[in-house]
Amino acid sequence: MTVPATRKDLMIVNMGPHHPSMHGVLRLIVTLDGEDVIDCEPVLGYLHRGMEKIAENRTIIQYLPYVTRWDYLATMFTEAITVNAPEQLGNIQVPKRASYIRAIMLELSRIASHLLWLGPFMADIGAQTPFFYIFRERELIYDLFEAATGMRMMHNYFRIGGVAADLPHGWIDKCLDFCDYFLTGIAEYQKLITRNPIFLERVEGVGIIGGEEAINWGLSGPMLRASGIQWDLRKVDHYGCYDEFDWEVQWQKEGDSLARYLVRISEMTESVKIIQQALEGIPGGPYENLEVRRFDRARDSEWNDFEYRFISKKPSPTFELSKQELYVRVEAPKGELGIFLIGDQSVFPWRWKIRPPGFINLQILPQLVKRMKLADIMTILGSIDIIMGEVDR
């Protein structure tokens, strides 16, 4: 009987760009020696839409609907960074009530993003049940968004100097009810997932990143905090009204996929604490800085008259961006989301550079998966939490 010769050469496999574990149109060219990963090369750009160039031909108000297409699971954060930049350039004050409403919406968006990370991440490593559970809570958040903004996703809710509309009657009570219910949901996830021996086998000690290594790679968000670095821009930059709430930065020191899971689960609990405090202490007053409507380029134009502004039509304000450079950032669910803005005395930005957290965090993937098993690629990629809309822009 002839025994077939065993081949020793390496095998090159394409994962994606339409693989169910890729979380978007990401392609990985993986070099395998049996089950062992020798090399991994991510191929990006399938979802590139020229978002930075589009910004250079739009006013800020015109550009707002575009930004929700970067990270389409946490759209409030892309809107927040878009209005924060001209607010800082023009030294525009945001009313206290608007600041509280923004914080509530941002933290609800953070929870929704973490939930839609948790479900597919668990499905990737073989646990199907949580995938259906997370949609139950996520639907409740989207119902709250729809009641306040009119849209479940792509809200277009933030405005320069405030928000588009005040919270509707009964919304605060409905949101407080959700917070009480969601805390029991998190406890349910902890029982179902955290101590599950099969889950621990798949994630414990997989994809370890040291603290110094995380800093050198420029990682941010849960990726950085899971490696022992207590860095959260809400505490570091003191933006918005976060200093008025009692909450803690969540971090772990192991740096593996389990640590990243624990950080995100704990962050959802902290977000609920922030939302509850904001809802109970929300002040009265305007939800928008109405003086912003006077910041039009043609200050003495007839279009600024009371009849045109408040009785007839409400044209979009065109803000003249002063000739200076500015970098602003927020703590998005996936990490540091930043905008580098250059103005040149025009209503259009001269340069609009996006610093997406997913793109920076994805850089470390090839190093993490080398010398690991093929099945660990799903675990590691899922624990990074990427959205290709913001990676490719």
Swiss-Prot record:
Asked if the keyword Cell inner membrane belongs to this entry, the reply reads no
- Which InterPro entries does this one have? NADH_Q_OxRdtase_suD (IPR001135), NADH_UbQ_OxRdtase_49kDa_CS (IPR014029), NDH1_su_D/H (IPR022885), NiFe-Hase_large (IPR029014)
Q: Which reaction does it catalyse?
A: a plastoquinone + NADH + (n+1) H(+)(in) = a plastoquinol + NAD(+) + n H(+)(out); a plastoquinone + NADPH + (n+1) H(+)(in) = a plastoquinol + NADP(+) + n H(+)(out)
| One GO cellular component term | chloroplast thylakoid membrane
Q: Can you list the disulfide-bonded cysteine pairs?
A: none
Q: Which residues cross the membrane?
A: none
What Gene3D superfamilies does the annotation carry? Cytochrome-c3 Hydrogenase, chain B
- GO BP annotations, alphabetical order: photosynthesis, light reaction
Q: Tell me where in or outside the cell this protein is found.
A: Plastid, Chloroplast thylakoid membrane
Q: Which domain of life is it from?
A: Eukaryota
- The UniProt record lists the EC number as 7.1.1.-
Q: Top enzyme class of this protein?
A: translocase
The UniProt entry, under SUPFAM superfamilies, shows: HydB/Nqo4-like
Give yes or no: UniProt keyword S-adenosyl-L-methionine: no
Q: Name one GO molecular function term.
A: quinone binding
Quaternary context: NDH is composed of at least 16 different subunits, 5 of which are encoded in the nucleus.
Which protein family is named in the record? Belongs to the complex I 49 kDa subunit family.
Q: What is the documented function of this protein?
A: NDH shuttles electrons from NAD(P)H:plastoquinone, via FMN and iron-sulfur (Fe-S) centers, to quinones in the photosynthetic chain and possibly in a chloroplast respiratory chain. The immediate electron acceptor for the enzyme in this species is believed to be plastoquinone. Couples the redox reaction to proton translocation, and thus conserves the redox energy in a proton gradient.
Name this protein carries in UniProt: NAD(P)H-quinone oxidoreductase subunit H, chloroplastic
Q: Which organism encodes this protein?
A: Platanus occidentalis (Sycamore)
Taxonomic path: Eukaryota, Viridiplantae, Streptophyta, Embryophyta, Tracheophyta
The protein's gene is named ndhH
